[in-house]
Every structure is written in structure tokens, then in C-alpha cells.
From Swiss-Prot:
Part of the ecpRABCDE operon, which encodes the E.coli common pilus (ECP). ECP is found in both commensal and pathogenic strains and plays a dual role in early-stage biofilm development and host cell recognition. Induction: Negatively regulated by H-NS. Positively regulated by IHF and EcpR. The lineage of its organism: Bacteria, Pseudomonadati, Pseudomonadota, Gammaproteobacteria, Enterobacterales. This is Probable fimbrial chaperone EcpB. Not expressed under classical laboratory conditions, but is functional when constitutively expressed. It comes from Escherichia coli (strain K12).
Amino acid sequence: MKKHLLPLALLFSGISPAQALDVGDISSFMNSDSSTLSKTIKNSTDSGRLINIRLERLSSPLDDGQVISMDKPDELLLTPASLLLPAQASEVIRFFYKGPADEKERYYRIVWFDQALSDAQRDNANRSAVATASARIGTILVVAPRQANYHFQYANGSLTNTGNATLRILAYGPCLKAANGKECKENYYLMPGKSRRFTRVDTADNKGRVALWQGDKFIPVK
């Protein structure tokens, strides 16, 4: 799989990443045995922030993913969807999946709109100031199939996901190339139907190890 799964879409308007709202992990997973997920966000700046959150369903979390319609209006809910976050404060955002309990994995983009509270309160005549202290951050939520089937194939340093739920795969051990050092490690997310070859770890070596996560379950492969 040439494209990394779950890219961060971070579009800033006049502020640096260090000043942006801290939304935690770029990608979040709701396992098949859970219908809720919590994310903690933090305002690490010295001023209050106005946060608005929107959800979009995606055909894929990869770069070529398109926004598609949800199966039902209340398929994925969240609370709170809008909040005022004081300086150096944090808040827990909760997500609730109420969609179909089928064998399909679903992908959502969480869009975080963040702007300085002082700018948000200004009138239309001063809207240019808002753009200098605002950000739009995109993260990904993967909802595993309610009926998850975990299957994979491994051969010659390559893993193929033959199931219907994304796997987190990893390899560690001696480096394949001496230029990379003695010990290497690789971590990837592997979507259903995709394959990934490890390129830094010498998986053919007896000390090379390959493993994966099926939800919360750790599975040694080699």
C-alpha cells in the first residue's frame, strides 16, 4: 500500500501548528464491540477558543477519498458540537455510532474549526482579523464493522488484509539495510483488501518479528 492510511488534513490560516488546538491522535478507531468513543482536546494557548465540530462520511481515508452520504441522519453523533474552551483548558468530546450493524467498515472525517474567542466576537467589519487566528483541522475516525471478520495472509515479508476491518501491523528486528542502523521498526495501518511489504526490517532474519492488532487483540505473525 503506497499511500499511508489516515493522513492528517491540517489547513492553517496564519497560525503555526504549535498554536493550534490539540485534538490528540490523527486517527481514532471505534472497535466492533464498542459504539462510543471519547477524544480529549486541549487549548494550549493563552486565550479562549471557539471550537465548532462537524462530521463527514468518507468513501476512503486515503487521499482520494470522497465525501459521501451517511446511511441515516443520526448514523454518527457527537457532543458537544460547539464549545468555548478557556486558555489551557481541556474538554472531552464523545462520539456515538448508531448506524447499521453490518460487515462494512466506515470512515469519517472530524473537522475541527478553531478560532480565537476575541476574534469570534468581533463584528463583520473586523472579519479579516478572524482569518489570522483560526484553523481548520481534519482527523479521521474509523468505525470497525459491527460484524468484523479478521483475516490476513503473510508471505515473504508482505502482509495482506483479507478481512473486512483495518489492521494495525508492525515489524521489528534487524534492519534490512546497514545504513538504517542495527534495529528497525515499522508500523502501518492496513485497510481491507490492501497489502503491505516491510521495507526497513529484515523479516527473513530469525530475529525479525511481525505482528498485528485485531482491534485490541495482539496477534504474533512471525
